[in-house]
A protein has these predicted regions:
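Conserved C-terminal guanine-recognition region of P-loop GTPase G domains, centered on the G4
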Residues: 111, 116-212, 216
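Conserved GTPase G-domain signal focused on the G5
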Residues: 39-40, 181, 221-242
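Short coil/turn segments at secondary-structure boundaries
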Residues: 44-45, 104-107, 131-133, 185-188, ...
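Glycine-rich phosphate-binding P-loop
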Residues: 29-52
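Short, flexible boundary segments at extreme N-termini or domain junctions of P-loop NTPases and their
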Residues: 1-35, 154-155
């Protein structure tokens, strides 16, 4: 009996090692998008090296150089998310949130064939009408690409071909900066499984339903990327929905 148990443990350990090596070679491809100043760069920095992140000044927000009349997309980089004793390799890129960069969201998402999309918003969607409208418009833009294949007209023939076949496995709405908006009511809603009914989620519900009807799973997570609050858990729980 002991021999069989030992053999079982060895096989399980070998399977876990094989899965980890596979992910080292082929990490989860994740897209991180959302409006400007919502915390995407902070999230990318935290995933690169965990720890408290210095606030990023407005004048230092992410921008992209222009070449031949087009904004240049940055290269995605490998990272490892450590959670509950396990390491999960991922690849992400830091892309600006201004509307002139939305085509880069589409390019990154489709060209890398990302299986998970994180759309990051912050507390401004709760108290600023312009910020909420901008965030909803950005989320709708991505949803239209995924559901209706409304890709940018600037796409090359090969990219258009990829776009017609592209569909992520999961789209997660990340409510960032929870250190600014989280309340006892928020905690109660999370505890009761009602996070999708939170007022910050309400403006995005219609497009989340559109994604679900197109066989794309959706998730809602709360984080404070600047302080690393719930970041690893949010990423891994979403990946596990694949």
């Amino acid at each position: 009996m002991a021999t069989w148990m030992l053999a079982g443990h060895i096989l399980m350990g070998s399977a876990q090692l094989a899965a980890y090596v596979y992910r080292l070679i082929r990490p989860h491809k994740i897209g991180i998008f959302g409006p400007s100043l919502a915390g995407k760069t902070t999230l990318d920095q935290y995933l690169t090296v965990p720890g408290d992140i210095d606030p990023i000044p407005v004048e230092m927000r992410t921008t992209h150089p222009v070449k031949n009349g087009s904004f240049q997309i940055p290269h995605a980089t490998k990272k490892q998310v450590r959670w509950k004793g396990e390491k999960t390799p991922i690849m992400t890129a830091d892309i600006g949130g201004q509307s002139q960069y939305w085509n880069l969201w589409a390019e990154d998402m489709i060209d890398r064939n990302t299986s998970v999309v994180f759309f990051v918003v912050d507390d401004r969607v709760a108290w600023s009408q312009p910020a909420m409208q901008e965030a909803v418009a950005g989320f709708k833009y991505l949803t239209d690409i995924i559901v209706n294949h409304r890709f940018p007209s600037t796409f090359s023939r090969s990219m258009k071909k990829k776009a017609k076949k592209y569909k992520p496995k999961v789209v997660c709405l990340v409510l960032n900066k929870m250190d600014l908006w989280w309340t006892n009511e928020s905690q109660q809603m999370w505890d009761m499984g009602l996070r999708r009914q939170h007022p910050m989620v309400t403006p995005f519900q219609e497009d989340m339903r559109r994604l679900r009807k197109s066989a794309v799973a959706t998730n809602v997570e709360a984080t404070a990327a600047q302080y690393g609050l719930n970041v690893e858990g949010a990423v891994i729980r979403t990946i596990n929905m694949i």
